Amino acid sequence: MKSIILFVLSLLLILEKQAAVMGQKGGSKGQLSSGSSRFPHRHRSQHYSGQKDKQHTESKGSFSIQHTYHVDANDHDRTRKSQQYYLNAQHKTTKSKQHLRRRQRLLNYKQKGRGRVKPKRHFHLIVIHRKGGQVHHGTQNPSQDQGNSPSGKGIFRQYSNTEERLWFRGLSKEQASASGAQKGRTQGGSQTNYVLQTEELVANKQQNKQQRETQNSHRNKGHYQNVFEVREEHSSKLQTSLHPAHQHRLQHGYKDIFTTQNELLVYNKNQHQTKNLNQDQEHGQKAHKGSYQSSSTEERQPNHEENSVQKGVPKGSISIQTEEKIYGKSQNQVTIPSQDQEHGHKENKISYQSSSAEERRLNSGEKGIQKGVPKGSISIQTEEKIYGKSQNQVTIPSQDQEHGHKENKISYQSSSAEERRLNSGEKGIQKGVPKGSISIQTEEKIYGKSQNQVTIPSQDQEHGHKENKISYQSSSTEERRLNSGEKGIQRGVSKGSISIQTEEKIHGKSQNQVAIPSQDQEHGHKENKISYQSSSAEERQLNSGEKGIQKGVSKGSISIQTEEKIYGKSQNQVTIPSQDQEHGHKENKIAYQSSSTEERQLNYGGKSIQKDVSQSSLSFQTEKLVEGKSQIQTPNPNQGQWSGQNAKGNSGKSADREQDLLSHEQEGRYQQEFSGAHNTVNIEHEVAYDDLLTQQYNEDRNPVST
């Protein structure tokens, strides 16, 4: 094998010298195509200037020939003859046709047995670009067993850049074809006189080449992306060499069309990308985005189409089930972390301690249906619907005792939170009736779509909780940012807990949220933004109108019901925190001691109607008039006992405030109540949908394209 490598090296040196001599002659033969007389000079500039100049010549696109050669010991004589044919331009066309057929037969034979041979084969795909600045991507069978094999590449590095890159083309052909992208070969392929020998074969062999490469692309289409994704993670050099030029065209199915023939070649359609996740239990994983400690988190950013189905619900382990479907596709995710006791957990983005969270960013629709309620574990049920798709999420963290939890963004201590950012509609239907726990049920509908979320954390005792953004101590919160309308229907009946039900409607849509944290004793709680101690809060930022209808009747607790109407829409929110004993509460923004607060930021004026039916609590009814809307405030405070509240910007004894943080209007309501004597809260919610006319009107204004 070593002798073969040295032989190929000497052959390449001879051919390079001959190409340089012919370049000095100036291309006086005259039979070359337009721009090919400058080929040897550009050829030499590509040798010593790296991929930047290669991409530059790609953008120029001054050539119109593509041909594939197989170089080994058996090919020596034919290669030398083809060089002689190039020197004798009159015989070049007829003689090289025969060699082209022989090389194609040899190439097809090598492609059939390629996956079963040792990974030291040297296929060189030489590509010359056609005029017009576009590149045709040649296709060969990817060898999945070769991987990142560095066979022979170090030997050629000892000689020259030219041979190194040419050898690298032969080496990385599998990686390049695995991604469907011949970026490496296209950028560095036109380096030897193999190309010069076939420059006048365009009119005769182009159609056969197109058909041949189309067949290869259809044959290899199933596992381009999969092999490329695996190898991409293990080699930064391959990322730099394979990623730059035309990866986006491959992922989105762009079309490369040859104009030298009457028959057009449409290439690279319907590329599929498949990602499979291993079902493992991971501990102590340090990453920039997600941290796993006997838990599971998944953040998915699909580009076009993904289908992954995994099943596994073990006891005391992590199970991830994922099926993503965009544009009529479906996705399921089940996350079940085990029952552990964790201390001192710190990460950058999302931290799990016997809890579960999911942050999803989607470009287009996903659909997922999941069912999983284990004992003493966390189950995430997700159904997202965009453009007629649906998603459900159920989060049930286990019952643990956790201490010293610190993170930057979202912290869970036997609780659950979800931050969702969606571009278009979602649909989800969830039902959760826990005992002594937290239940968040949410249904979002955008352009006639809906979503439900159920979050049920357990009852824990937590101490020393500190974070930057959102802190949970046996409580629940949800921060939602949506671009367009939401619709939700929720029902939640819990015992001795907090229930928040919210229905937001934008452009005739509605949403409901139910948050039911448990009854705990918490000490020393400090954070930067929002702090919960056996309470519940919700911060919502919406672009346009909201509609919500809520009903809440609680005993010995605080009930806030809010209806905001923007552009003829309304919203109701009910917040009922539980009765706890809390000490030493300090935060920067909002402090709760057995109380509830809602901060709303809206772009336009709103209408708010609140109704309270509770014992020993505060009731406020507010109606503001902004831009043709009215507002009425009716304070109806009750007698309460307050002690030990220290908050920056908020402190009161039987008092309430309102903060306006809006461009036009923002309503914040504070209701405070002493620690009551009842532990049972029964809530039944009935939510009415909007009428069909509004939905059809909005769908007519916003047509859905599948």
Curated annotation (Swiss-Prot):
Q: Where is the composition biased (Polar residues)?
A: 137-151, 329-339, 389-399, 449-459, 509-519, 569-579, 611-622, 630-653
Biological-process GO terms, alphabetical: coagulation; negative regulation of flagellated sperm motility; sperm capacitation
Q: Which residues form a coiled coil?
A: none
Q: Which Pfam families match?
A: Semenogelin
**For this UniProt entry, which residues form the secretion signal?**
1-23
Q: Which UniProt keywords apply?
A: Repeat, Secreted, Signal
Name the UniProt record assigns to this protein: Semenogelin-2
* Organism this protein belongs to: Macaca mulatta
Provide the taxonomic classification.
Eukaryota, Metazoa, Chordata, Craniata, Vertebrata
Per UniProt, what is the name of the gene that codes for the protein in this document?
A: SEMG2
